[in-house]
Amino acid sequence: MFGADGRPAIGTAAGKSWHFSRTMEELVHDLVSALEESSEQARGGFAETGEHSRNLSCPLKRQARKRRGRKRRSYNVHHPWETGHCLSEGSDSSLEEPSKDYREKHSNNKKDRSDSDDQMLVAKRRPSSNLSSSVRGKRLLWHESDFAVDSLGNRTLRRRRKVKRMAVDLPQDVSSKRTMTQLPEGCRDQDMDNDRASQYPEFTRKKVKKRKLKGIRPGPKTQEEGGVLESEERSQPNKDRMEYEEQKASDELRSESDTSSLSSTDAGLFTNDEGRQGDDEQSDWFYEKESGGACGIAGVVPWWEKDEPAELDTNLPDPVFESILSGSFPLMSHPGRGGFQARLSRLHGTPSKNIKKSSGAPPSMLSAPGPGSNKRMVHFSPDAHRHDHWFSPGARTEHGQHQLLRDNRAERGHKKSCSLKTASRQTSMHLGSLCTGDIKRRRKAAPLPGPTAAGIVGENAQPILESNIGNRMLQSMGWTPGSGLGRDGRGIAEPVQAVQRPKGLGLGFPLPKSSPTSPAPTSGNPA
């Protein structure tokens, strides 16, 4: 590959002859590969790799693969056998002058030799049939092309076209600023401005391959990055030409839309090509924060960068929440408002009398609005401190008296009790919830009914009277009082005895041995 020190020797005769011989060898290789690819295109399409196209068995394999339905088309004028676009920027810039001289000398000869390429491209892009003759002199040696260039050419171009359709246009000030900063680097190529209309796909392809080789082989990255930037800068002014070419290749975009997903799974390869140039500049513009955009959208300031406080941070009182806390619902009906206030006051422990006075129940709920009803309400509505004393041990008697008073007043009449229950429905529910626990405690503390001493249950019980229904039933079946049960009187004459042990003693306590005082003329169970 040519280095920077080879430039002074270009003007000499030895340098020119050596350069001419090397370039002729390249041209021979190019013609051979072009003939192979043109014959293969007539059978099934372009070859995927330039290195495999030299073998005779590879075209047969590729033709068999094309028959399965995968349609391969190249978006670019340059084909996979044109491998000079993968070189670094240092080698590329060092060969621009001899390549230009060679193009000026042998332009007619190369036009004659590139007829096969022109015939191969006339079906797809008719105006670019003479592009191969003007660009072929820029290619370099065959040993520069490696596997990355040969295998990744068409995939990246397909992906470039698809992402290009989704690219976001840059603002005018940002694009103009980047263009002004890019002009000094491209001044050395001003003599090639006439060929840019036909050579912009070459720069795009060169940029893709250089970026892919950068991710694969470890080498000096500064020159490669510079080369990529320069390629982007060269292709920036040709945006209108690219859009024109893209409209002409719209049918190719439709045919390749199904195969574009194959290139999206290439791991570890970042294709910063012309199609994604708008996205890259957009992200740079957002990173530089020139217009203050949010997520790449101009004119939208994100909420975390706003100077004024947000609405959530002002701590303004919410009228709905305040109305819920205070219990004042302007849209609620009067009965619903009173019921809510009653439940709220009951939760806070407010007496029921105050509840009724503050809530203002409607007249429809008071069926008997008289002094008697109000009197009953006062009697059945204990105040807060009395409620606190209910559960104290010294107030059992007072609580029992209140309980009896409520029971007696409830039994005075059906109508009056119904009106009382209707008027004091909330009060009754409140009293019931308060008295339930105390009643359970009182029942648990009361002594159990029955004899507390040990002995036989019902030992001193009176005999069953003859008017008892059980006694008369047994006599109707043939039983006579004083005899045993059964037809012959041989059954039991006394009821089954039940012995009660003292409290706290289990089964080991000895049973009392006592006999009944009377001959037990009874036949039924003791009462």
From Swiss-Prot:
Basic and acidic residues bias spans: 97-116, 186-196, 231-257
Gene: Gpatch2
Protein name: G patch domain-containing protein 2
Stored Pfam families: G-patch
Source species of the chain: Mus musculus
Biased composition (Low complexity): 510-527
Keyword line: Nucleus, Phosphoprotein
Domain of life: Eukaryota
Job description of the protein: Enhances the ATPase activity of DHX15 in vitro.
